Amino acid sequence: MNKWTTQEMAQRLARDIEPGWYVNIGIGMPEMVCENLREDDDIILQSENGILGMGPLARGDDIDTDLVNAGKKPVTARLGASYFEHTTSFAMMRGGHLDLCILGAFQVSGSGDLANWSLGRPGIPPAVGLSLIHI
C-alpha cells in the first residue's frame, strides 16, 4: 500500500478546492491545507471556533494572541472577516452554508471508517453529522 504523508494529503486536498468556495478548516491536518491554497483563488476560510474570513497563520509582529484558529494557533483575518460563537459556526456547517468541511481524523480504518473525536467518556462529539459524504 502506498502511504501518503500528511503534507502530501494536505497538498492534494488543497488542489481539489474550487475557487470562491467557503471552506471550514478543522484541527490537525486540515490546518496544513491552508498553507497550500492558492491566494488568487479567493477561498473563504471558516474556523469552527467562530471566524469567517480566516487568513494565514500569523508570524512575528502579526501575532495577536486573541486571534487563533480552532487548533489554538495564531492566525490573521482577511478584510471583512466576521466573528461569532462556535454554535453559529456549527450551524453554518450543518445547515449547508459552506461548500466544504475539512475535518481532522482521529483514526481512519483500512476500509475508510472514521473516528474524528474522543471525549474520553461516553457522549456525542460536537462534529457528529459533519462527516457525512455527499457525492
Task: For every predicted segment, state its role.
Residues 1-78:
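N-terminal active-site beta-alpha-beta segment that forms phosphate/nucleotide-binding
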Residues 9-12, 31-32, 87-89, 125-128:
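A generic local structural motif
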Residues 39, 109-111:
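Short acidic-glycine loop/turn motifs at beta-strand connectors
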Residues 59-109:
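Ligand-binding beta-strand-loop-alpha-helix segment within the catalytic cores
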Residues 81-87, 119-130:
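Active-site glycine-rich loop that binds ribose-phosphate moieties when present
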Residues 111-121:
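Glycine/threonine-rich flexible loop motifs
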Residues 133-135:
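Conserved small/polar residues in nucleotide/adenosyl-binding loops
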